[in-house]
Regions:
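Conserved alpha-helical "signature site"
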Residues: 1-132, 136-211, 251
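Terminal helices and disordered tails flanking the catalytic cores of nucleotide-processing hydrolases
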Residues: 215-252
Length: 252
C-alpha cells in the first residue's frame, strides 16, 4: 500500500533525500514542489516511486569504483540509464507496456556485466581484451570465449532478487529475442532501446541506420523507427537529466 511504501522509505533518510531530489528534478518536470514521500507517492504513483527506490539502490550497490583496462564503469551506467530512458519513452509513446517497468528493465539489462567484473575478474578481462582486440560487441566476445553471456547472468540475478518474470525475461533475452519470453512487448522495447542507444552513440546523427533489430520488434514499434531523428534528440535531453541525478553522486 501507499502507507507501507512511504513508511518503509522514511526509515532511510538518505533514501528520502534522494527520492525527493529526484521527484523535484527536471527528470519529472513537475510544477509544484513535493516535500514528503507520501505526497510523492500520491502524485507520481506507487510503481514510479517503488521503481525509483529500486533504481537508486541498485546503482548505489553496484557502482564499482575502479575501471578495468579501458572498461569505464561510469560509461557503463550512462549506457544503462540511456537504455532505461529510451525504453520509458517507447513505452509511453506506444502504450504497450508500463513505462516505469520499462525504465527499471532498461536500467538493469546489462547487470550481468557487473557480476562478471566483480566476481569473475579474470574472465571479464579475457572477454574485454577480445572486445578491444577484435572490434566486437561484448555479447559477441562472450559467445566466442565462454558458454554463458551477461544477459543470462542478469536474468539469473534478477530472478534471485524475485523481480517479476516479465522483467527477468526482458533482461535475459534482450540480445536473443525468443517467443518464450513472459512478456513480448517488454522484451521488444528493451531489445530495441539497447540497439537505438548503441547505434546513436556510434553513428553520425544524420546517418542513423539501425541494424540487428528483431522483425517482431519492427512490427510492434515500426512507426517509431521512421521518425527517430525527430524524437531522439529530445530523449537525449531526458537522458542527460537522468544521468545527472542517478550518477553524479554514485560515481564519486
Amino acid at each position: 500500500t501507499i502507507n507501507k511504501l512511504s513508511d518503509a522509505i522514511e526509515k532511510d533518510q538518505a533514501m528520502v533525500s534522494k527520492i525527493l531530489k529526484l521527484v523535484n528534478s527536471a527528470f519529472f518536470g513537475l510544477r509544484g514542489k513535493i516535500s514528503n514521500i507520501s505526497h510523492a507517492v500520491v502524485v507520481l504513483g506507487f510503481n514510479t516511486i517503488r521503481n525509483a527506490v529500486v533504481s537508486i539502490s541498485i546503482i548505489d550497490a553496484f557502482s564499482v569504483k575502479e575501471s578495468l583496462d579501458g572498461f569505464d564503469i561510469a560509461e557503463f551506467w550512462k549506457h544503462s540509464v540511456a537504455v532505461a530512458v529510451t525504453s520509458k519513452y517507447l513505452a509511453e509513446k506506444t502504450g504497450i507496456h508500463s513505462a516505469d517497468d520499462c525504465f527499471v528493465a532498461g536500467l538493469l539489462h546489462d547487470m550481468g556485466k557487473i557480476v562478471l567484473l566483480q566476481h569473475f575478474k579474470d574472465l571479464f578481462q579475457k572477454i574485454w581484451r577480445t572486445v578491444k582486440g577484435n572490434n566486437l560487441s561484448f555479447y559477441e566476445a562472450e559467445k566466442s570465449q565462454i558458454q554463458i553471456d551477461h544477459a543470462r547472468i542478469g536474468g539469473y540475478l534478477t530472478r534471485k532478487w524475485q523481480l517479476p518474470p516479465a522483467l527477468v525475461d526482458a533482461i535475459r533475452f534482450h540480445h536473443c529475442v525468443t517467443p518464450d519470453a513472459n512478456d513480448q512487448n517488454l522484451l521488444m522495447i528493451i531489445h530495441t532501446a539497447d540497439i537505438i542507444v548503441n547505434t546513436y552513440t556510434k553513428k553520425p546523427k544524420n546517418d542513423l541506420v539501425l541494424s540487428g533489430i528483431h522483425p517482431d520488434a519492427l512490427n510492434v514499434l515500426g512507426s517509431r523507427f521512421d521518425t527517430i531523428s525527430d524524437w531522439y534528440p529530445d530523449v537525449l535531453l531526458e537522458i542527460e537529466s537522468a544521468c545527472k541525478f542517478f550518477l553524479e553522486g554514485s560515481m564519486k
